[in-house]
């Protein structure tokens, strides 16, 4: 499948995978890509498959000459679902912001190398962390 930008989707998936453990291929559809990061374990006592994590997820949409994004901070529960919830621990928020900025920078640089831009979605008004320079 070729995206509106003219790039084959399979090649983009390969490049996105090389950015790190972020892309969830099974949740990517058509010209939309899904990334997430399980940044901070809520409690290490449960068995690994039953742990919950604080983290973020990002939806990326391919358009003609750009990719647009929207993201959320929240909880990845033991069933494997994301829920947007307020996070009150300063250290956790700082870690989420750091990992999101790091990923955003790598993603932006990759897209620039392909002569594409990365911008917030037109309807993404609630950007808790400013990412674009």
UniProtKB/Swiss-Prot annotation:
GO terms for biological process: positive regulation of DNA-templated transcription. It comes from the Bacteria. Residues 90-111 form a coiled coil. Residues 99-122 are annotated as: Essential for activity. Belongs to the Crl family. It is found in: Cytoplasm. HAMAP family: Crl. GO terms for cellular component: cytoplasm. Its main location: cytoplasm. Keywords: Activator, Coiled coil, Cytoplasm, Transcription, Transcription regulation. This is Sigma factor-binding protein Crl.
């Amino acid at each position: 499948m070729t995206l509106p930008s003219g790039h084959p989707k399979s090649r983009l998936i390969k490049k996105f995978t090389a950015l790190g453990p972020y892309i969830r291929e099974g949740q990517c559809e058509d010209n939309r890509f899904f990334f997430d990061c399980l940044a901070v374990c809520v409690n290490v006592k449960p068995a690994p498959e039953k742990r919950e994590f604080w983290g973020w997820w990002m939806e990326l949409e391919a358009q003609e000459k750009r990719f647009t994004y929207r993201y959320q901070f929240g909880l990845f529960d033991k069933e494997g679902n994301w829920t947007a919830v307020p996070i009150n621990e300063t250290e956790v928020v700082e870690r989420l912001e750091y990992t999101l900025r790091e990923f955003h920078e790598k993603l932006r640089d990759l897209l620039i190398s392909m002569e594409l831009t990365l911008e917030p979605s037109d309807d993404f008004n609630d950007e808790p962390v400013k990412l674009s320079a």
